[in-house]
């Protein structure tokens, strides 16, 4: 009996270790904000959290990113790196909140080391100017005894190629086409044999297709306006000209052939209240003209676990 118990207990222990290791090599993506500059309560500004091993990486840091993190019980100080796709305001306005609130000592903050951030040229300048803007606040906090180390910033301007390798997590930046916002980047994150790609803001782009090949999940932006609005509104035409339409995104998905395609940073253009607002259902229907594979319309706080199986939860 003792031998059987010993064998059985060891077997169960090994099984638990194996299961833990499998789960431990999953990628977990949480869409924190899936919206645009429009201040919608249901779609916060662009931001996504990627959890891979001990790393908690943010792709962009738009409006309300910290609120969504705390809704998922992730301390702001636990974020180990931020990667900016480009420097349009809707992708960066959450940075001061994440940086400084994450430095505070209560459980929602508690960052002990430097705030680490990567992005296109201008990122170092952005952070240097934020340090100037919040110098008084930082001085007050330090006078209250909060260690200065948590307010330090390590900012890097990057170019295309591998930009981060730590704890088995590899982040690769690649250039995309966001018209006048140059350079703009997408990111591919690889971990434990699995991968996720974030398009960033882009028009239909061959470089994105190249770097997305073999990815498990492709998270892509999309923009759409009703044709009758486009005929009338130059502002709507300009916005659409910066982004990828549903039919174009479907073409990208078809050529990349990911295990799952997901929309985030959903830009539904409404420059004139006289026209009916476009909907997410419109976007999905149009995408099906050029893509018939697995597809999800991203929502704030949606989670995607990427392992041997892909599990999506709202």
Task: Spell out what each predicted region is.
Residues 9, 89-90, 220:
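Residue-level micro-sites within transmembrane alpha helices that shape
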